[in-house]
Amino acid sequence: MDITKIPQYELLEHHYVRELESEGYLMRHKKTGARVFILENDDNNKVFNIAFRTVPTDSTGVAQIIEHTVLCGSDRYPVKDPFVELAKGSLNTFLNAMTYSDKTMYPLASTNDKDFFNLMSVYMDGVFHPNITKERKIFEQEGWHYEMDSPDGELTYNGVVYNEMKGAFSSADEILGRQVKAALYPDTTYAYESGGDPEFITDLTYESYLEFYHTYYHPSNSYIYLYGDLDMEKALNWMDHEYLSHYEKKEIDSAVTLQKPFNKMKEISLCYAASEDDDEGTYFTWSKVVSNALDLEKYLAFQVLEYVLLDAPGAPLKQALLDAGIGVDIYGGFEDGILQPSFEVTTKGARQEQREVFVETIEATLRKLAEEGLQKRSLLAGLNSLQFRLKEGDFGRWPKGLMYGLDLFDSWLYDDKAAFLLLETQDAMDELYKKAEGSYFEQLIKECLIDNSFGVVAMAVPKVGLDAENEEKTAEKLRVYKDSLSKEEIEEIVRHTKELKEYQETPSTKEELETIPMLTRADIKREVLPLYNEERSMDGVKVLFHEMSTKKIGYLELVFDADFADLSELPYLSLLKQILGVVAAGEYSYTELMDEVNIHTGGIDPGFVVLQPETGRPTVRFSFRIKAFYHELETAVNLTAKMMYQSDLANEKRLLEIIGETRSQLYERLKSAGHNTSIKRASSYHSESGYLNEIMTGISFYEFLNDLYDHFEERKGMIIEKLRAVSNQLFNKRALLVSFTADKEGYDVLKKAMDTLIKQMPDEPFVKADWNMPLEKKNEGICCASQIQFVGRTGNYKDAGLPFRGSLLVLQNILNYDYLWIRLRVKGGAYGCMSGFGRDGDCYMVSYLDPKLAETNEVYDKLPEYLEQFDQDERSMDRYVIGAISEMDIPKNPAALGVRGLTAYLSGITREQLQKERDEVIDTDAKEIRALVPYAKAVLSNNCLCVVGNENKIKENSSLFTTVRSL
């Protein structure tokens, strides 16, 4: 049957979307008015998404708390956490729920038809028939609740969203961004924090929460998206029969209102929490509302201007601020995903007294650019970069159908008739190429960035001790509240705390679990994916060819063995990665070089990786990852050669800028991704590969950059000399391995492109450096301005003589969605938890945005006891196995398949070995999990602990640490 003829739906628009090679259908469910958009094509990675327009009128986080809770059981699926059951036991390729400023969405993806409909059923039942209306404890667990274990104990707040947002509000960037948004759109829903401000989350009542749900979660306020090679008729009929037809149309006022422009720029000031040793200087943000989400031309043009003005090395706006000494890290750009997008510039590491000169520098630079014109080559580079991204459709591990769906909402949410707008971009791009030859972009700067008072200038200054102040304020508020309670009311809180814990500790019944639809092991493909590795040679250089169709894009990786570098040189190798491509090379200035890269390629990205082969010591490989259409491959290789052999490593001013910017960005990552920081640091205590990773990307590298930056004047000669020495040894023919993903035609083009480069390469003897790594168990508590913790524990089972087994990947799934999840997230209130078991023996467990510390470490210590008593029936084991396979089988595009083959080759992993591991995963039973007790004991016996987080919490638990220090 033709889906346009299904009687329950009205077809509003249908045509072929050439950019996405898809048939597009915009439809409406006749009875309820539910909006439906379909992209039908041959992609077997199918996507479903149901979204609701949600417009908060306060910052209690009600939208996010509902997002967390509707998937905590429903009428048809009464288990306590269907989302987790799906995550640990389906073949999903994506499974999540997301809260935005003005919408809440529930997307999923799967390549398996049966699995896809199972997932869709659980999601639809969750959003329309959730248990939240029957069980208040779901709201308390995920949102917030009072917690007190005894009448004379301390009264505290707990809740997953409450703790998540305490973490978010520990970041200066996040706080500043939220305040700027509130100032730009004061009369709209954007003035409020949809995720919740910890100060106001505890004002949310259960009744207000249910009222918000009943207001917005109705088919008449829904947006449903289907994508891929899917039986659309079946999906549409099923949705109507099972859910939509049960509702009547309802008028729901969820429209997002426009903010009236300002007559003059606003100014705001705020403080962010800092510690004595943890001060990122003053932040400034300059932001202007520049467009409407329904203006496609501006939507694309401002992405180009983001590159031209800010992102490109030497971009005029960024460079003007750096030259004026206003901060060390400048970033920003086009902020979309809302009704009235803005363009903003932020500088970090400035001084408070520079506020006026910050604004003057931006405005003077923009005026000059509008009058004198932008560099045409830079505009072409920005356009080509955007065009390549749109055509390639490479979103890493995220399904492209998911990402197209997210783009769809940037227009559809604000105009029912504009669903196709941001998917059909080619005509608008063609028009922009023509307009770039004239003064269109300069006029845009004048109209939107100069002659426009609809904006905000914000300043955020560090305040030492603000975290402690806020903690004391919260504690005092709770003390006053407790003092106001009667004895009976206090006993009621204690009783309710106990009841909530009992609720959290009570597992779903066998009957409840069996309501969740699931696959069996028989639905899993047993055969492992091939490696697509064919060894070839070019003029004495080994080539790893991964032959497959790539739409005439060549994915090239030039991989250099960097094991010649001694331990003191490896941080310089890491710094070199930051420098190449953003300094002058050959006849090109650094701005011109990046323009040439973007005009001719889809990117030339230097990088490195630390690998632990099956035998022997770890290895460091430095690479250039290049992607270009076949006809541009030769130019791409020539540009890479210039970066390798003609980069200007002696430009002192540029070098200092790069070191300062890298230091600033790394600091932000170390703090905001504290789970990675703690794992990396703890691994360096016992693991050689962990040690190398840490000195090149972790806290040690940050300290190295700090030292270079603080002593640059006296050491600049030595720094330049070290960089040259590392570079000269690195790009050596004998150290090179070429990895190439394309078809035969592409390979023939590559041979010609590589010929000149290989002939000009030095051909010197290659000698590996001796690495005597000073491994030392430091067990550090690392304090930073944060309201929560990241608690990491690492170890190694191979040190105990134990081999890698596929069942460890099943154990990882069990920990992530059962053992750790229940104890750290459900009961402990941490936002997240994860674990990993590597082939090299290195393992970790870590919590994310965690209010606890010692209690979390105790959970890690009790893992062997849990495994000794582990006993699950076959259905439960099927679920764990399927979840592990799902993680292994994430669909990969050609570029990712090439990287997979290369990584296996460098690590000494064969297809036979991968097949053995897959068989072990599929055949894992409860007995096999119990047999992993020695592994857990071996890992924990290393007792390597690192915690990043709140200073007071770390000092309260100082007995756990050998060292307590600041970040």
Indicate where each model-derived feature is located.
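Non-catalytic terminal extensions that flank enzyme cores
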Residues: 1-47
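His/Glu-based metal-binding/catalytic segments typifying zinc-dependent metallopeptidases
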Residues: 37-42, 49-51, 162, 166-174, ...
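M16 family metallopeptidases and their MPP-like homologs
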Residues: 45-55, 81-129, 136-147, 174-199, ...
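Active-site His/Glu-centered metal-binding helix of metallohydrolases
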Residues: 62, 66-70, 576
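Non-catalytic, conformational "gating/processing" segments within enzyme and secreted inhibitor domains
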Residues: 158, 210-241, 698, 719-754, ...
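Extended, regular secondary-structure scaffolds
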Residues: 211-213, 223, 232-250, 372, ...
